[in-house]
Amino acid sequence: MAKIVKVIGREIIDSRGNPTVEAEVHLEGGFVGLAAAPSGASTGSREALELRDGDKSRFLGKGVLKAVAAVNNEIAQAIVGKEGCAQSEIDQTMIDLDGTENKSKFGANAILAVSLATAKAAAASKGLPLYAYIAELNGTPGVYSMPLPMMNIINGGEHADNNVDIQEFMIQPIGAKTLREALRIGAEVFHNLAKVLKAKGLSTAVGDEGGFAPNLASNADALACIKEAVENAGYVLGKDITLAMDCASSEFYNKENGLYEMKGEGKSFTSQEFTHYLENLCKEYPIVSIEDGQDESDWDGFAYQTKILGDKVQLVGDDLFVTNTKILKEGIEKGIANSILIKFNQIGSLTETLAAIKMAKDAGYTAVISHRSGETEDATIADLAVGTAAGQIKTGSMSRSDRIAKYNQLIRIEEALGEMAPFLGLKAIKGQA
């Protein structure tokens, strides 16, 4: 066993040019873990707090020196001397020291960076790859799978400066036999989509997550462009590739009148009408997964949507559940959605993240491991997806090195594990096995 001897926090830059927190945890024996906190654009109101300085003279108020100071002072003083492998104890120490419901004293960005850096240092001290150590922490040592990628190839909503209301249009290469093959298929469709958009005189500029961000007449147009790209790449939509969407509905939900206002299309829907709008898209295209298909507070709308679509479509709660076991437990009891999106920084520690994945799986929900729109070269989510055998991962498109870092780490892991980590493909998606 190796004790923590030093903790260092620093301000680094994320993929959107904003500061974020990086933590370095040193153990006895010279073992070091380095981790950075990601940052979201479309955020759930009940997420753990990302602490920003608010000093307009630095980074337009988005500096994180307060969170870094918490790492270097209070957090460091509290955990130096503790065993590096005592992950849950270290996480709980930080949570208790913060003392707030949403980690607003130190910031979830500070606590998470230290939590993940600790896990990396501990894995190194045990001579284990991070995914193997995560599997041990998860209580499932040696149980792995390679995740099916949800590849966000058209960006809209808060992730792009365009008129497309739905935030993410994704492809899932279900016909692949391996993760590496899935990435090849995704790349081929991505490049063909660029050609399709250019031929239509549309922009091939990319959004925060590496997908294209053209102005389109409708959400159905985005799906039609993807269909054309899939076919041009030589694949069959529905057989080789299925589709997924992240509506991020809270971003266009008007709380005053209770309507979903899709300004890009000039349409407004009631809660039930929006479910049927999505249902019609699912009839026209092989959409097998929909994320945040209602506003985070519209639980009646989610219940109706689950009743209408839940037996044939994976309904993923992101802003709905915010990786929080208290909220997820209530959702499970009420039969809301059937899957959860897992984002480390929504809850703020590795221990709490693993608890959310376990609760979801125990209830028959799927868990989709996810990046944020503001990312770094940190690829921990790749190891999390494999080490928990989650089955699915969302980490952007086939461009931007902050996204590709995760895919490349998955390639390395698949190579190392071979048959020990099966690629589940379509079977990983709720309702599709």
UniProtKB/Swiss-Prot annotation:
Keywords: Cytoplasm, Glycolysis, Lyase, Magnesium, Metal-binding, Secreted. CDD domains: enolase (cd03313). Binds a second Mg(2+) ion via substrate during catalysis. InterPro entries: Enolase (IPR000941), Enolase-like_C_sf (IPR036849), Enolase-like_N (IPR029017), Enolase_C (IPR020810), Enolase_CS (IPR020809), Enolase_N (IPR020811). Its main location: cytoplasm. Disulfide bonds: none annotated. GO terms for biological process: glycolytic process. Its EC number is 4.2.1.11. Pathway: Carbohydrate degradation; glycolysis; pyruvate from D-glyceraldehyde 3-phosphate: step 4/5. The keyword Lyase applies. It catalyses: (2R)-2-phosphoglycerate = phosphoenolpyruvate + H2O. It comes from the Bacteria. GO terms for molecular function: magnesium ion binding; phosphopyruvate hydratase activity. It is an enzyme of class 4 (lyase). It holds the Pfam family Enolase_C. One of its GO terms (cellular component) is extracellular region. Its cofactor is Mg(2+). It is found in: Cytoplasm; Secreted; Cell surface. Mg(2+) binds at residues 246, 291, 318. (2R)-2-phosphoglycerate binds at residues 167, 343, 372-373, 394. Catalyzes the reversible conversion of 2-phosphoglycerate (2-PG) into phosphoenolpyruvate (PEP). It is essential for the degradation of carbohydrates via glycolysis. NCBIfam families: eno. Belongs to the enolase family. Component of the RNA degradosome, a multiprotein complex involved in RNA processing and mRNA degradation. This is Enolase. It comes from Haemophilus ducreyi (strain 35000HP / ATCC 700724).
